[in-house]
Design a protein with these regions (language model features):
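Short, glycine/serine-rich, charged loops/turns that create anion-binding
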Residues: 17, 137, 161
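Glycine-rich adenosine-cofactor-binding loop
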Residues: 14, 106, 116, 127-147
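NAD(P)-binding Rossmann-fold cofactor-contacting core
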Residues: 154-171
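Conserved S-adenosyl-L-methionine
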Residues: 148-153
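Phosphate/diphosphate ligand-binding glycine-rich loop within oxidoreductases
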Residues: 2-121
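Single conserved hydrophobic/aromatic residue that forms the stacking wall/gate
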Residues: 174-184
Length: 184
């Protein structure tokens, strides 16, 4: 069977997971472009993450997206990690290679930047302070992508200021942490 005729199975892995709309979106595009495949929810608790990730190849999956709370933990199970994902310290996408090797990527920041550029073609990261809400895995990726785009000042707001300060301490020197709703 040629690769183009092969049924492709993928999904989104996390816990909780059923609130994710990813299967609706991915299955729409699979159908629209006539790609033989399906995309579903994979509810996996942290204690079962390694077994689930290592089982992707054996089950014949093309890969999966990774979401809370697994973005950092799943990195340890990859055979290869994209350089950008290494810098971000988290992955959100696993691709199963033909030889069964697991390749980890992070496209959170790229997706965010592209969305902003699509909505505001004249946008420039260095035009003024940028506000980022949250300090989790996606925020980490977005902040790094903003820095790569030339942002001079990023204001990070999180419910717990210690989490925001933790993100800043990792490597982002031109961030300022703020408690929710204060001195933005």
């Amino acid at each position: 069977m040629s690769d183009s005729n092969k049924f492709k199975l993928a999904g989104v892995m996390g816990m909780p997971i059923y609130q994710s709309r990813s299967p609706i979106l991915h299955n729409y595009w699979l159908a629209k472009y006539g790609i033989k495949g399906a995309y579903g929810h994979f509810p996996v608790e942290l204690k079962n993450l390694e077994a689930a990730v290592r089982g992707l190849s054996a089950l014949g999956l093309a890969g999966c997206n990774i979401t809370l709370p697994h973005k950092v933990h799943a990195m340890k199970m990859m055979d290869h990690i994209d350089p950008l994902a290494k810098r971000m310290g988290a992955i959100n996408c696993i691709v199963v290679q033909e030889d069964g090797a697991l390749h980890g990527f992070n496209n959170d920041g790229y997706g965010y930047i592209q969305c902003v550029k699509d909505a505001q073609p004249d946008w420039r990261a260095d035009a003024g302070p940028i506000l980022v809400l949250g300090a989790g895995g996606a925020a980490r990726a977005i902040v790094l992508s903003l820095v790569d785009e030339g942002a001079k000042e990023i204001r990070l707001v999180n419910r717990t200021i210690s989490k925001a300060q933790e993100l800043i301490a990792v490597s982002y020197t031109h961030l300022r942490a703020h408690e929710t709703g204060r001195n933005l």
